[in-house]
Each structure stands twice: as structure tokens, then as C-alpha cells.
Amino acid sequence: MELIFLGTSAGVPTRSRNVTAILLHLQHPTQPGVWLFDCGEGTQHQMLNTAFHPGKLERIFISHLHGDHLFGLPGLLCSRSMAGNPHPLTVYGPQGVREFIATTLRLSGSWTDFPLQIEEVSAGDILDDGLRKVTAFRLEHPLECYGYRVVEHDKPGALNARALKAAGVTPGPLFQALKAGKTVTLADGRQINGADYLAPAVAGKSVAIFGDTAPCEAALALAQGVDVMVHETTLDASMEEKANARGHSSTRQTATLAREAAVGRLIMTHISSRYDDKGCQRLLAECRAIFPATELAYDFSVFPV
């Protein structure tokens, strides 16, 4: 998997940062895909500067209904429809996202020519496509807001073909059953348990993508042990009280969460427009002082998971 940041500003766009949107590129050899997390104003325009377009999107996850995370959605849906893409799309989000989509399409005389499914979520598992699971966590914000934890299922370990050949099993259809961990019966009556010839399973990758939030109990469960945590750092440590009062987090609080959750890497985003490049570097330094494995996202930054 890899993350492509389309917008990294909080509240309003700046000359160098658009409002929130993140692509998750699912780099699977047989079932690749592209998911979008939040869709602030101008998201479809930002996508024009990437290798992806709205027609490739399979799922969109909205954290909450504040405009800087949502106002780009109607235009993106309409453009996807005008392009003649017939592939289905599912939108996940809090209560009200269905009404928002229906109302904006109706009042603007717009529609979608592709199957559009809208799922209003609550805390808990919301998706398992056989390759990965998505769990929603309710966060602390003035509006109903969620963070999404995406975890790939573990991959089976490699089959020890050399040991199987030594046991008299020739490559062929039986290998597929053995690779699945099944027990097969050979022509001579012997039974071979595939699990005995498999290397340990390879742990799937995981990412936690937070919506806007002040520190809350659910945050630790959402982030616990993930390879990558994407979290807002709206304000610096000196403005922590102001951040929390508005349902946001400071640099210090975000980095402390990353450390306590034992994540592999923290990616900072949702930066207040008050910070210029020098100010952003100060935010990054504040996080790294607590959690060194921290990166600052810019628009069009790409990070592997």
C-alpha cells in the first residue's frame, strides 16, 4: 500500500496546500485498487496531478461533514459520472452523508450514471473485502467524526517446494492445496499436511487514518501497533488548549499518541494556514522531539506503508 496526499491544510486552502484528501493505493498483484479518505474542495483537481482519476476510485471514506473534508465530493461524483465510468462506487461516512449527497445532487440537477452505494457508519468493523479489513473509530470532534484503521490480512508463508520434492511430491495441482494449508492424500496413500511445509505467515500492513480529533480514548485503539499513523497536527504545542477546545490536537499530543501506540511511523497533516514553511518545520521538530519517526506531509507527498 502507499499513501498519496492530495490536500494537507486545515480548514481552508493555502497557496501550497489544499484541504484534506488522501489516496490509499492498494498495490495488490491481482486485486489492486484506489480508495479516497476525505474529499475537501478541489480534490478532483488535485487528482489531475497524479496518476489516478476519479474513475479508478472504488471506495471513499468520509471522516466527518465539515466542509474542508467534504465539499469536493459532489463535484467528484458528477465528474466521475460524466466520464462514463460504469464501475460501482461506495461512500462511507457519518450520519448525514447520504442526505448531503442526495440534496446537493438534487438541487443542482445532477445525477450519477454508475451504481452508487452510501453506507452511514458507526464504530466497529465496516468492511472486509477478503484481503483487508476496515474498522471505524469514533473520535472527539464537534461533529460526528471517525478515524479508519485499514489492516491487510496476513499472507500465507512460502511453500517449501524443495522439502516437498524430497518427500516425493511433484509440482502440480497438489501444490496449490498444500499452499492453502490443506492436507492432501498422495497416490501411495500417504497424507501430507501443507501446514508442515509452510513458512510462517507474513503479517499484513496496517495504517490508521485519523479524522479531526482532540485526544480521546478511542485514539489509542485506532493507532495501536500500525505501520503508519496519519494524524492531524493542526496547532503547535503552545496552542494546545485552543486546539482541544475546537476538537483538534497539538503536535505534542499527536507525537505522544504515536509513541504510546508504538506505531511504526507518524505522518503529520491538517496543518493550520497560519504556518508558513518555517512554521511547518517547527511543528515537525516538536513532533520529532517526542517521536523521531515522524514525517510532514505536503500536497502530493507519497509514503509507502
From Swiss-Prot:
Protein name per Swiss-Prot or TrEMBL: Ribonuclease BN
Domain of life: Bacteria
Catalytic-site annotation from UniProt: 68
Family named by the database record: Belongs to the RNase Z family. RNase BN subfamily.
InterPro entries from the UniProt entry: Metallo-B-lactamas (IPR001279), RibonucZ/Hydroxyglut_hydro (IPR036866), Rnase_BN (IPR013469), RNase_Z/BN (IPR013471)
Function comment: Zinc phosphodiesterase, which has both exoribonuclease and endoribonuclease activities.
Binding positions (Zn(2+) 1): 64, 66, 141, 212
NCBIfam families: PRK00055.1-1, PRK00055.1-3, RNase_Z, true_RNase_BN
GO molecular function per UniProt: 3'-tRNA processing endoribonuclease activity; exonuclease activity; zinc ion binding
Presence of the UniProt keyword Ion transport in the record: no
Details of cofactor binding: Binds 2 Zn(2+) ions.
Keywords: Endonuclease, Exonuclease, Hydrolase, Metal-binding, Nuclease, tRNA processing, Zinc
EC number: 3.1.-.-
Cofactors, names only: Zn(2+)
Top enzyme category: hydrolase
Entry binding sites for Zn(2+) 2: 68-69, 212, 270
Organismal lineage: Bacteria, Pseudomonadati, Pseudomonadota, Gammaproteobacteria, Enterobacterales
Subunit structure, interactors included: Homodimer.
Keyword NAD: no
HAMAP family: RNase_Z_BN
